Amino acid sequence: MSIKSDKWIRRMAAEYDMISPFEPDLVRQVNGEKVISFGTSSYGYDIRCADEFKVFTNINSTMVDPKNFDEKCFVDVKGEYCIIPPNSFALARTVEYFRIPRNVLTVCLGKSTYARCGIVVNVTPFEPEWEGYVTLEFSNTTPLPAKIYANEGVAQVLFFESDEVCEVSYRDRGGKYMGQVGVTLPRS
């Protein structure tokens, strides 16, 4: 299993629509304004956060239970940025829609720009033949409010191609997050 380069990422995006919309270069400015970079890098793809967020709140005094998740735990926010309360978190989704080939697995890591501000980005691997918008989790580990910018880079996806094709893919087993759109909450 080896990590894939910018050349491979560009080819897969063009030939297989693996990432849509796709940015073939690393973008650092938009309309003359600095942004947190996104697009194709040397050995990965920097994904963007869309403008829809679900911010964790305790106003309804509910319990967090991954097997029986209550949507009242979140407040919906839409905009150019999202403010995450101290020691809290928010969910969002990517701008990009992914279609992962059967012989590929991805690992996603948060960008250092956010990590250096105490903001942790968590994303699980994209499994073989999974497709959809990626649900992102932002944890604000600081005692201060934290800002997340929509339509700018938040994490980097690394692509690993296997030497052999898996016997059962995410699609084959009917994975519960297949084809997800919008910000997707836990499913049991």
Swiss-Prot record:
Binding site for dCTP: K111, S112, T113, Y114, A115, R116, T135, L136, E137, Q156, Y170, Q180
The protein's annotated pathway: Pyrimidine metabolism; dUMP biosynthesis; dUMP from dCTP (dUTP route): step 1/2
Enzyme class: hydrolase
Reaction catalyzed: dCTP + H2O + H(+) = dUTP + NH4(+)
Pfam families: DCD (PF22769)
Source organism superkingdom: Bacteria
InterPro entries reported in the protein's UniProt record: dCTP_deaminase, dUTPase-like_sf, dUTPase_trimeric
Location of the active site: E137 (proton donor/acceptor)
Single biological process term from Gene Ontology: dUTP biosynthetic process
The protein's Enzyme Commission number: 3.5.4.13
GO molecular function terms listed in the Swiss-Prot or TrEMBL record: dCTP deaminase activity; nucleotide binding
Keywords, in A-Z order: Hydrolase, Nucleotide metabolism, Nucleotide-binding
Family: Belongs to the dCTP deaminase family.
Assembly and oligomerization: Homotrimer.
Function of the protein: Catalyzes the deamination of dCTP to dUTP.
Protein name: dCTP deaminase
Upper classification of the organism: Bacteria, Pseudomonadati, Pseudomonadota, Betaproteobacteria, Neisseriales
Gene coding for it: dcd
